[in-house]
Structures are given as structure tokens and as C-alpha cells.
């Protein structure tokens, strides 16, 4: 059975496209949702730390965390569903993983592609607008610092910048 193409019904308000990731983007989406239904969130998939990094490595899928956060921000669901998406396990082998990330990982496992999994989760959550991964390729962030050092991996870049107190000269996406 071929999955139907994801179409956003005509919505009210100005058309807004946002690009980013992390807590900042999801917080902005919560605010934008109050003013327009025409939101396209283009979300980073370069995270390599925490639970997203583990799912990325173990399951060979794009990191789900930033995508999940954006869908959670745009969701039109019952409060218990928001609570579930945000829930983090505290014990055992799932400690640190969020239910929302695992839910998206499970959808990825039963879908033909990560894009299809994102569309399915968007439908389940009845999100306002749409959430799109910035790329479907497996990519890493690479940063070149003023001192000449080059670091690969979002989590390592943050750590190196904090430890070295050195400014980043250039950032680029590289295929993994």
C-alpha cells in the first residue's frame, strides 16, 4: 500500500518558514502557532549527543530529538499526550530516553522512510503546520576553530568550545 502524500490543508495566517533546532526553535514555534497555521519548520538532524545520538547510532536513523520537540510544540492533542511525549525514563537501559523519541523511532521502524515516520507522527499529533528534516542524509557538524583545530560532532563542538574558550571560525555539514 502506498502512503498518501502529506498535504497541509489551507490554513489561516501568514506563511512562515523557520530553520533551526533545539529548545529555541520549539519555543518559537509555540509562540508562532498562536498567530498562524501556515508554519513550515525545517529542523536540524545533526545532533549526536544524548538519547538522540544513541538512537542515531543504534538504529541508523536521523536523530529524533529536535524533530520531536518541534512536533510537540505544534501538537493539538490532549495534555496527557504532551506529557507522554516529554516523559524521560529514569531507570534501566532506557534511562535518559524520552518517550517521544522512542515513539518516533518506532514509527521510523514501521515506515518506509524517516520522512514518512515524521508525516505519520504529525498526523497522530494533529500538528499545526508541518515539520521537515533539513536533510534525509546522514550528516555531522564540523567546526573549525580560530586556533586551527577541527572538531566533528555537535556534542564535541560544544564541549571543545567550552573547554578551549576559542571562537568558531567556520561550521559546515559533512556526510557521515
Language-model-derived ranges and their functions:
Residues 1-16, 30-33, 37, 41, ...:
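Non-transmembrane, aqueous-exposed alpha-helical and coiled segments at domain scale
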Residues 21, 44-47:
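Cofactor-binding loop segments of dinucleotide-utilizing enzymes, especially the Rossmann-like FAD-
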Residues 3, 169-176:
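Glycine-rich oxoanion-binding loops at beta->alpha junctions
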Residues 17, 23, 40, 120, ...:
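Functionally constrained cores in energy, signaling, and assembly domains
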Residues 24-29:
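Short glycine/serine/threonine-rich phosphate/pyrophosphate-binding segments
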